[in-house]
Amino acid sequence: MENQRRHIHYDGDKDKEFVLNSFRKCITEKREIDKFLEKLITPYIKTKDLKILDACCGIGYISYFLSELSSNSTFFGVDQTPYLIEEAKKLCSNKKNISFEVADIYDLPSRFPKKFDVSISWRTLSWLPYYDQMIKDLIAVTKDHIFLSSLFYDGDIDFEIKVREFQKETGKEHFNDYYNVYSFPRFQRFVYELGAKNIEAYDFEINTDLPKPQIDQMGSYTVKLEDGKRLQISGAVILTWKIIRIDL
């Protein structure tokens, strides 16, 4: 459990420019899944005065966009990677209702018990060794609602998927990422056992075409099916996204 609690996603400054450029694209080319979050979360935050946690916030682009929808709320973003928080502070330097801190989500319950009205964990769970401690800690710091996105399977099977990108600095030394797909029924049972009152799940189906990246690089692209729908794929992994709202 301690290894899981102290899982370090990025290895120092290795692949720093690649990581930063990937995040910056979320600002210049807003992703469809991020637009979907805005649609789902708007009724819960618009024109309200809330304390909102952006857990594992990266460069803070989710807070950057959502602060426009809820200008009276305060946003607090945390990430364990210093250069991402540095970039987040630059991005949101003109937004007085957003603050950032280098911190580990697993240390927050002791500092902020039931402090936040709403918490967001965006595109994080599938890139952890497992989700259980993360969910426990999000519930511990949240009063009302948690919004998250992850890869889920509708059957009672978990898939642990490790990725090693040999063209990256970290991939030269070891497996550098997870792309886990979790059993949604098991996830539901787990969250209800922690005291959640309600769970709503929304399948994300992309409506735009995404080009395939270089063959040696993970990255989302789409394949159009005969019925007009699109599969999202990264490497050899089908991205079965769900957006989850947990009501506490």
Pin down the residues of each PLM region:
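Conserved glycine-rich SAM-binding loop
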Residues: 58
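Class I SAM-dependent methyltransferase SAM/SAH-binding core
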Residues: 61-107
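A short glycine-rich, Lys/Arg-flanked "PGG" loop and its adjoining helix->strand segment in the class I
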Residues: 132-144
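A C-terminal cap/extension of S-adenosyl-L-methionine-dependent methyltransferases
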Residues: 200-248
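Conserved class I S-adenosyl-L-methionine
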Residues: 1-46, 147-171
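A short SAM/SAH-binding and catalytic strip from SAM-dependent methyltransferases
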Residues: 118-130
